[in-house]
Amino acid sequence: VPFVYGVQAYGLNAYVTGIGGTKRIVLWDTIIKKLTPGELLVVMGHEMGHYVLGHIWYSLIYGSLFLLLGLWLIHLTAGWVLRRFGGRFGFTELGDIASLPLLILMFSLFSFIMSPAALAYSRHHEHEADRFALEITHDNHDCAMAFVTLTENDLGYPRPGWLYKLWRSSHPPLGERIDFCNNYHPWTEGKPLKYGKYFQNDSGDPQQ
């Protein structure tokens, strides 16, 4: 990633964005001020994980499929809706501009129904980026403390109920992320790293 940008803001956030020559990691100035150097390295490792693992591309593909699925479901159901309620709506064809509010309503409904799958996919990417950060830094303590700081700063609830997680959480709950930071250390147990092929040791060989 050729560029790292700082952004003035009030919350704590960092993200990777861009494709090709526009790719960059963005760190809000608040996260630079509030986290220790070790914690910032973990955050950078997390964002590097998103980039190295191609999460932006996967998200673009998944988002496109999600859009197509929503449009396909509208195509399947719109005819029945018009036959059933068209007289009340004042139009009988989707080609009528007056049908636009109905299309928006139907797409919003299908998006809501499909959101648990989309959010689960997002949480998986975030979890794997956390794993990447731990494997590249080997720093369990700073990883956990970074999420503790995020929890305190955002006044977040670290362990929400399963229903909230299912329908609202694009990231794993902070409590789960802290637990993972504390408990994931295959390098101390002689186990292979899942993403060791992306790292090099002092001799230039991939880490195992």
What spans do the regions from the language model cover?
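Polar-ligand-bearing catalytic/cofactor-coordination segments
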Residues: 1-94, 104-208
